[in-house]
Amino acid sequence: MDKSESTGAGRNRRRRPRRGSRSAPSSADANFRVLSQQLSRLNKTLAAGRPTINHPTFVGSERCKPGYTFTSITLKPPKIDRESYYGKRLLLPDSVTEYDKKLVSRIQIRVNPLPKFDSTVWVTVRKVPASSDLSVAAISAMFADGASPVLVYQYAASGVQANNKLLYDLSAMRADIGDMRKYAVLVYSKDDTLETDELVLHVDVEHQRIPTSGVLPV
């Protein structure tokens, strides 16, 4: 046998199997694969349909978009009688409204129940006409027209309902800081009278970064 034949025979020789054998896939492995596939489908679904002003979603804490920061407004609703309403326009600080052409990407509402909270409230953000006086009748009509997605927040024995946030994406609308006065937070006290010491609302407006002062206030 010449050298070439010897080499060919070596190549054709079957590789010796490794010692031992791999165990059959366990049920845990199969469950993990199914879970991974479900998470993959969920991620694709979320990526395809990001929340908009008409389709908000509950979210956990999120980082601001690159190049953006946020300004928070704290609202303490006054006493609201049972089946009555409250509305407050989004009024940002002067130091922010000075840059009224900076774009706004998202608005988030966070509901913070105080220890005495034992009610059910509906909360939303609506773009309202400048002529609207946010009267009870006007707010009632906006809740009733079905055009406003609503966060229903109810008393929870643990103190905080699992879903206490509502996010609106305004990116597609090219809204800016100057437009924020056209938006208002609306509250409906459904089952009980809401007292002044029961609830605090935090509104986070995510907008393009603005210059910050390097001088301490006098």
Swiss-Prot record:
What keywords sit in the KW lines? Answer: Acetylation, Capsid protein, Ribonucleoprotein, RNA-binding, T=3 icosahedral capsid protein, Viral nucleoprotein, Virion
User: Where is this gene product found?
Assistant: Virion
InterPro entries in the cross-refs: Cucumovirus_coat (IPR000247), Cucumovirus_coat_Asu_sf (IPR037137)
Spans annotated as Disordered = 1-28
Q: Does the keyword Acetylation apply?
A: yes
The main location class comes to: virion
Q: Does the keyword Metal-binding apply?
A: no
Gene Ontology molecular function terms on file: RNA binding; structural molecule activity
Bias type Basic residues, positions: 11-21
Question: Which domain of life does the protein's organism represent?
Answer: Viruses
Q: Name one GO cellular component term.
A: ribonucleoprotein complex
Q: What is this protein called?
A: Capsid protein
Originating organism: Cucumber mosaic virus (strain Pepo)
Lineage of the species this protein comes from: Viruses, Riboviria, Orthornavirae, Kitrinoviricota, Alsuviricetes
